């Protein structure tokens, strides 16, 4: 049986899709909440991973080992880095990077975990499906590009500019995607990140995040709905 894995970090990021699912069965493993059911005619496992890279890595490992999904979509909110994007707009990964990893002293690239790729490539078919879904979610614009992950909420303008200097091509940042991508890489499971902006990094981010998290979660969920409808 083919299953699709959907991963969001927080209650707010998984609530919309959870409400749309049918025949839902909840299972908790090691503190990670899995919601198994049907969505848009597909068998899905919706995972609430918890916030941050360690939580994301642990829960994604459990998802892949216990449920063996065909592919994984990382959903939820992000902080915008691309100046053309606004709160509520969508970002789709073509690559994902750990923006806070630095082992350059041993010859690795900035963001590269030793013996891992410098960036993690999203599955091209899933990226194309996300772009196609965008045509049906008309209230947002989107960018496809590099998404950066770090264990910090990016509300400090100085830190934002430091990260931007290292990765000028970043379209958005968040706190889980590279961990999800790294685990998917090790398992050989295709993935893509489809998130919506809850804030613009460095610009009153905490206030914007609280206010627009629901909007971001809804827009991200609408994208996933259209992706699954198209399959």
Swiss-Prot record:
- Its EC number is 3.2.2.9
Q: Which Pfam families does the entry mention?
A: PNP_UDP_1
Q: Which GO terms describe its molecular function?
A: adenosylhomocysteine nucleosidase activity; methylthioadenosine nucleosidase activity
Any idea which UniProt keywords this protein has?
Amino-acid biosynthesis, Hydrolase, Methionine biosynthesis
So which residues are the signal peptide here?
Answer: none
Q: Name one GO biological process term.
A: nucleoside catabolic process
What residues make up the catalytic site?
Answer: 13 (proton acceptor), 199 (proton donor)
**Which reaction is recorded as catalysed by this protein?**
S-adenosyl-L-homocysteine + H2O = S-(5-deoxy-D-ribos-5-yl)-L-homocysteine + adenine; S-methyl-5'-thioadenosine + H2O = 5-(methylsulfanyl)-D-ribose + adenine; 5'-deoxyadenosine + H2O = 5-deoxy-D-ribose + adenine
Alphabetized InterPro entries for the sequence: MTA_SAH_Nsdase, Nucleoside_phosphorylase_d, Nucleoside_phosphorylase_sf
Q: Which GO terms describe its cellular component?
A: cytosol
- The residues that the entry says bind substrate are 79, 154, 175-176
What the record says about family reads: Belongs to the PNP/UDP phosphorylase family. MtnN subfamily.
- PANTHER family for this protein: 5'-METHYLTHIOADENOSINE/S-ADENOSYLHOMOCYSTEINE NUCLEOSIDASE (PTHR46832), 5'-METHYLTHIOADENOSINE_S-ADENOSYLHOMOCYSTEINE NUCLEOSIDASE (PTHR46832:SF1)
The entry's protein name is 5'-methylthioadenosine/S-adenosylhomocysteine nucleosidase
Source organism (scientific name): Marinomonas sp. (strain MWYL1)
Recall the taxonomic lineage recorded for the source organism: Bacteria, Pseudomonadati, Pseudomonadota, Gammaproteobacteria, Oceanospirillales
């Amino acid at each position: 049986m083919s299953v699709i894995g959907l991963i969001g970090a927080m209650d707010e990021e998984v609530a919309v899709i959870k409400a749309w699912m049918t025949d839902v069965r909840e299972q908790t493993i090691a503190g990670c909440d899995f919601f198994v059911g049907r969505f848009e005619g597909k068998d899905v496992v919706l995972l609430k991973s918890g916030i941050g890279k360690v939580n994301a890595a642990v829960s994604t490992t459990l998802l892949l080992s216990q449920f063996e999904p065909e592919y994984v979509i990382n959903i939820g909110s992000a902080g915008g880095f691309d100046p053309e994007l606004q709160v509520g707009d969508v970002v789709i990964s073509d690559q994902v990077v750990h923006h806070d990893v630095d082992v350059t002293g041993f010859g690795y690239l900035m963001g590269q975990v030793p013996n891992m790729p410098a960036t993690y490539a999203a599955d091209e078919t899933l990226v194309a499906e996300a772009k196609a879904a965008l045509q049906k979610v008309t209230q947002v614009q989107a960018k496809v590009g590099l998404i950066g992950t770090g264990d910090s909420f990016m509300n400090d303008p100085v830190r934002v500019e430091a990260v931007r200097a290292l990765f000028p091509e970043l379209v958005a940042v968040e706190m889980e995607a590279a961990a999800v991508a790294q685990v998917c890489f090790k398992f050989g499971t295709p993935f893509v990140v489809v998130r919506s902006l809850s804030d613009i990094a460095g610009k009153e981010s905490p206030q914007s995040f609280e206010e627009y998290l629901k909007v971001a979660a809804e827009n991200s969920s609408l994208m996933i709905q259209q992706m699954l409808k198209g399959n």
